[in-house]
Every structure is written in C-alpha cells, then in structure tokens.
C-alpha cells in the first residue's frame, strides 16, 4: 500500500510540474549572430519551458528554417512545429548577406512540408489552441509578431507576456532587432500586451569567453559539438570577438525573471526621424500621463554570473528528455 501511495504521489507531482511549465513560442533569426542558436538550445534544455513552436524571421528565412530544424533534430525535438516567417520587414527591405553558420547545412538538411507554412499563421493557431495563455519570445526583428497581432487581433488575451531581446534603453543606440523592422516594433510595443524587453545595454554584459567558453567546448555530446561548430564559423568572421549572449538572456528571463532587475513604463519606437530611426524611447511609469498604462518592463540590471552558470549547466548537459 505504501508503494502504491508513493507511486500515486509521484505521478501527481509530475503532472503538476508539467502543468506549471511555461508554454512559449520562440521566434528567431537564427544564423546571423551566434546567440540565436544558443538561445534555442537553452530553451530546449530548460525543464521550466515547454516550447510549443519555433518560427524564423527576416532575410533568408528558408535557410534559417533548415538550420533551426537541424538543431531541433540534434536535441531530439522534431515534434516541435516549425514555420518559415517573413523574409522582409514591413518597411525598407535591405539586401541580406549569407550567414556563415549556414555552412553546416548539407543537401540532406531538408525540412518537412509543414515547415513552409507562414509563421504568423502558426503563431495564431498555436495561441488559439492553447488552454492557457502563452509567452512569446521573439529574439529577432518583430515582423512575425506584428503580423500575427494585425492578422489575429483576438489573440491578445492568449498572450501572457512577450519577452523580447531588443532595444537600448539607457543609451542612444539603434539596436538591430528594433531598427531592422521599426514599424513592426512599434506595433508590438503599442499593442497593450505585457512586454519584458531585454535590451542591448544589459545583454552586452553577458559574454561567453575564457573558462566559460572552454567549458562549453569541452562538453561531449553531439548537440554541444554542433553549437561549438557554429561558434567556430561565427568566429571566423569575427576573429577578435567572443559570443555575447543577447538572445539567451531573453530566453532565461522568460522562465527565471529574477535574473534581471526591471523597471516599469512605456516604450515608443522612433519611426519617422532618419537619424533616430529604430531608437527605443522609455518613459518610467511615474512619468506617464494619466490614462497611459505602463505595459512594459525594461531590464536594468542582470545577475551575470548567475545567468552564465545557468546557461552553461543547461548547454553542457546531454539533450534532455522532452
């Protein structure tokens, strides 16, 4: 009887734990900077997170989708729906350059037919099918998220929060993710959906170098070796640089928000001034006019060592069971 009760207790505990996992959709421009592939790995390796879908965004999204599918396979997660997103921003298309990380792909790295569907459609369908609100984690330009919000305005109650990597809130700087599709960014920030914005001025403190990088390189499993290969390809084009973990910090903030300190307020994206296009203007909650809601939390500080320890523990471990 005692063994039976223990089995029931463990089963109930496991079920409760599973229900508490945070359902997320990860939207990524994987293949450019190295941090996207590392962020996807962190999401897949974190038991607090239930990755319900992955979508790709901007430029050569077909090849980005192939790279994401290859990484999902190395972690045993071809069960996760994948979709190809918008290849151009809502304004001002820019001719893309081919990313070095795509060199890991071969002719055998194809994707299922379902992955050719539009990302905004997958985002909408996944949100509407979820019994509980979900967290969106966009770590590239916000084109797909803006398209989903415009195409499916009824999805807003289904979004618990958007945790994004983007912006620069303590310095005058045109951070790439926001600048690349500033119109989409303004749509997202003005949507009324709760947002946590992890900006460049905080993520720049999170470098993967020295003993930390050596620890990842020493990890002996196929997924970690794949990440190391991507780092090598990226460093070939950036020989004097070490990976900066912009996107992984946003992923971590989605399930361990205590890693960052935040401030509440409102964000406006500059879209009309040539010199300042793409800059993010933050106004703290106590300075907002009456009737204007503070829907955004911006990151102000980060526990760098705590984040790096979490990141390395997850990415050096063998791929976990889903």
Predicted regions and their residues:
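Active-site histidine-anchored catalytic micro-motif
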Residues: 20-30, 34-70, 109-211
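Metal-dependent C-N hydrolase catalytic cores
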Residues: 20-21, 63-129, 294-303, 307, ...
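Sec-dependent signal peptide recognition
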Residues: 2-7
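Glycine-centered secondary-structure boundary/capping sites
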Residues: 14, 73-76, 257
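Acidic/polar N-terminal loop/beta-strand segments that form early-domain functional surfaces
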Residues: 55-59, 85-87, 272
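Conformational coupling and interaction surfaces
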Residues: 20-21, 39-45, 50, 179, ...
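Histidine-centered active-site/metal-ligand motif
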Residues: 36, 101-102, 144, 246
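Hydrophobic h-region of N-terminal signal peptides that target proteins for export
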Residues: 9-18
